[in-house]
């Protein structure tokens, strides 16, 4: 046999071996690039959140199959239809929301039939786009510091004013209730704030209660001598609002600023997005802000 024959067989064998090697490498790369499931990502969150995971919690899957491979993560304050549509358009099929998706704290609307057209269309949209919705509320608040509060303090630029003995309390440079409300609205991107109290009252002692803490915690904050103004997300008008109005009428140096639930916690979920990126890899993570639903008539 000629040397050319052996050379040809050698290169043929080498070529087959190279192809096999490339095939194995490629298959290994595919295995490494396999998209994580929503369930796997939640397990990572549980491992990194830094507080014991509670059995009784609203931090559970609300829609979709948890074993769905994740194409992208949309982190949001509230999984409204608008947020879901934007997430789907960006190929983000795993939505992590702070607040309920289906109009009730437990995501089971009381007194609403499953045939309700709004509820039904929202469920159908999630199913059509192979989306998974998971709530991250309790344990994000349980972190030290509270994840929502941390994000809000950063957004407001109040880090240097925050009290060590009372993390929800702040000692600001002297301002008025009017200026405080206006500056808060500007920083949080909301023009729809409501205020109880004298707009010209000079204040320095502030308390921040994001979201909807409830009457007991809100009034306990307002009754403190070291709190002149309480900023809340939302509250019942016949509870904390009435209490604040009575305090003002009685001549007490008190004011209440109602920010709105979404803008009062939104920056906290943007903070969550940044935190997730420190340990969740191999998948796109984006903060999708919820829009302020209210507007002012002109």
Residue ranges and their predicted role:
Residues 2-15:
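Bacterial N-terminal signal peptides that target proteins for export
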Residues 8, 20-298:
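Hydrophobic structural segments
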């Amino acid at each position: 046999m000629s040397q050319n024959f052996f050379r040809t067989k050698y290169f043929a064998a080498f070529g087959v071996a190279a192809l096999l090697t490339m095939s194995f490498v490629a298959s290994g790369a595919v295995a490494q690039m396999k998209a994580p499931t929503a369930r796997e990502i939640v397990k990572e969150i549980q491992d990194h959140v830094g507080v014991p995971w509670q059995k009784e919690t609203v931090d559970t899957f609300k829609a979709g199959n948890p074993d769905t491979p994740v194409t992208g993560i949309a982190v949001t304050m509230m999984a409204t239809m608008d947020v879901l549509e934007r997430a789907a358009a960006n190929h983000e099929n795993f939505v992590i929301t702070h607040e309920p998706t289906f109009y009730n704290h437990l995501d089971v609307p009381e007194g609403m039939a499953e045939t309700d057209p709004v509820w039904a269309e929202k469920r159908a949209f999630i199913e059509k786009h192979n989306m998974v919705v998971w709530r991250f509320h309790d344990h994000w608040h349980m972190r030290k510091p509270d994840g929502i509060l941390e994000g809000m303090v950063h957004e407001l630029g109040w880090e240097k004013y925050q009290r060590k003995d009372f993390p929800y309390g702040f000692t600001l440079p002297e301002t008025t209730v009017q200026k405080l409300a206006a500056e808060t609205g500007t920083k949080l991107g909301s023009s729809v704030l409501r205020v109880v109290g004298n707009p010209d009252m000079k204040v320095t002692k502030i308390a921040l209660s994001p979201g909807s803490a409830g009457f007991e915690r809100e009034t306990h904050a307002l009754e403190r001598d070291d709190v002149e103004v309480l900023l809340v997300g939302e509250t019942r008008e016949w509870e904390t609002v009435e209490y604040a109005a009575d305090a003002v009428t009685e001549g007490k140096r008190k004011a209440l600023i109602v920010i709105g639930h979404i803008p009062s916690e939104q920056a906290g979920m943007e903070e969550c997005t940044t935190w997730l990126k420190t340990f969740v890899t191999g998948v796109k993570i984006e903060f999708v802000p919820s829009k302020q639903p209210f507007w002012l008539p002109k």
